[in-house]
Every structure is written in structure tokens, then in C-alpha cells.
Swiss-Prot record:
A Pfam family the protein falls into: Ribosomal_L15e
Cellular component terms per the entry's GO annotation: cytosolic large ribosomal subunit
Chain intervals for the UniProt region annotation (Disordered): 155-204
Record field: compositional bias (Basic residues): 191-204
Species in which this protein is naturally found: Caenorhabditis elegans
Sample GO molecular function, one term: RNA binding
Family of the protein in this entry: Belongs to the eukaryotic ribosomal protein eL15 family.
SMART domains assigned: Ribosomal_L15e
Protein name according to UniProt: Large ribosomal subunit protein eL15
Biological processes per GO annotation: cytoplasmic translation
Keywords annotated in UniProt: Ribonucleoprotein, Ribosomal protein
Length: 204
């Protein structure tokens, strides 16, 4: 086994004494930093490489801190208006995962970069920490490399905001088979429109 395989096995045993101590120290350190900050190199290099990261020019890694728990509705003094059924403020569940939220925050903060992927690094009772791999689409090293040219196209702008990353796709209910009948045709909206549109074929 190579070195990355050993590192992968270490990260799988998160309850080991060494990793528990390491994560406790790291979460304390991460809490002192800003919510979105750049890191010089990936904390988990074997995981980052599996997700597409390479130690080349044009690749950057940012660490994002996301608060755990429910999503609170951003209203002034709890004034939601409307019917009592929609008066909820505190117990609302976010449709996106915390990882997808972290990717979105990094993508908004760094608008000129493209989000490639992300992975979990640590968590405590209050926060979850993710590292997001981003690519500079205007760097010559990226534009000249056949493996990374695809992300420089305009269609991939803010792909993290449209549920096109790995974490974003998981909340869209996509897949094949009878379990995913609600999203046949690409999305829930596309599926609903197809089932609720009457088509009258012209008689010839």
C-alpha cells in the first residue's frame, strides 16, 4: 500500500486516540480563524487528490466554517406574516447539506474562481469545517491542460449555486430506477411539467 492508502485508513478511524486528540486541537485552532480563509495546502491530501486537486498553479484550497443545526429564517423580530402554518422561524430544515452550504459560501466569496469539490475536515458541537477546492479558470496552466479545460467554459460559472457539484447533486434526488421516479427527466420541476402537460397529436 502507498502512503495515501495509510492516510485514508487513519482518517477512517476517527475514534482513535490520536485522531480524537488531533481533531480537538484543530477545531480549537479553526475557531480562532475567519469563517472563510485560504489554507496553504490541503489538510487531507489523499482525499483532495481523489476529488481532483493537484499541487499545480491555478488550484487553491479554502477552509469554510458552517454553523451546525437548523436553518433559522432571516426575519425581523419573528415577523413572518401570512398564515399561522408558515410562521416557523427556528425549526426549519435546510434542503441543502452543510457541505453544499460551505461550497456556496466559498463560491460567493471568491467569484472569479470555480468550485471543483469539497470534503469534511473537522467538526465540534457548534461548527462543521470543510475544505473547498477551487480553480482559477483564467490561469494559463489550467487553460492549457486538457484535464482541466472543461471548467474554464462559461457554463460552469457558479456551478456550486446550481447544485452541480458532488455535494449539491445529493440533495436534488437524482438517480435511476423506481426510487427516483420523482426526478425523471432531470429534475422535479421537469418531471411535474411532463406529467401535467396535455399533448394533443394532430390527426393526419
Amino acid at each position: 500500500m502507498g502512503a495515501y492508502k495509510y492516510m485514508q485508513e487513519i482518517w477512517r478511524k476517527k475514534q482513535s486516540d490520536a485522531l480524537r486528540y488531533l481533531l480537538r486541537i484543530r477545531t480549537w485552532h479553526y475557531r480562532q480563524l475567519s469563517a472563510v480563509h485560504r489554507v496553504p495546502r490541503p489538510t487531507r491530501p489523499e482525499k483532495a487528490r481523489r476529488l481532483g486537486y493537484r499541487a499545480k498553479q491555478g488550484f487553491v484550497v479554502y477552509r469554510v466554517r458552517v454553523r451546525r443545526g437548523n436553518r433559522k429564517r432571516p426575519v425581523c423580530k419573528g415577523q413572518t406574516y401570512g398564515k399561522p402554518k408558515t410562521h416557523g422561524v427556528n425549526e426549519l430544515k435546510n434542503a441543502k447539506s452543510k457541505q453544499a452550504v460551505a461550497e456556496g459560501r466559498a463560491g460567493r466569496r471568491l467569484g472569479s474562481l470555480r468550485v471543483l469539490n469539497s470534503y469534511w475536515v473537522a467538526e465540534d458541537s457548534t461548527y462543521k469545517f470543510y475544505e473547498v477546492v477551487l480553480i482559477d479558470p483564467f490561469h494559463k496552466a489550467i487553460r492549457r491542460n486538457p484535464d482541466t479545460q472543461w471548467i474554464t467554459k462559461p457554463v460552469h460559472k457558479h456551478r456550486e449555486q446550481r447544485g452541480l457539484t458532488s455535494a449539491g447533486r445529493k440533495s436534488r434526488g437524482l438517480g435511476k430506477g423506481w426510487r427516483f421516479s420523482a426526478t425523471r427527466g432531470g429534475s422535479q420541476a421537469k418531471n411535474w411539467k411532463r406529467k401535467n402537460t396535455k399533448v394533443f397529436h394532430r390527426k393526419r
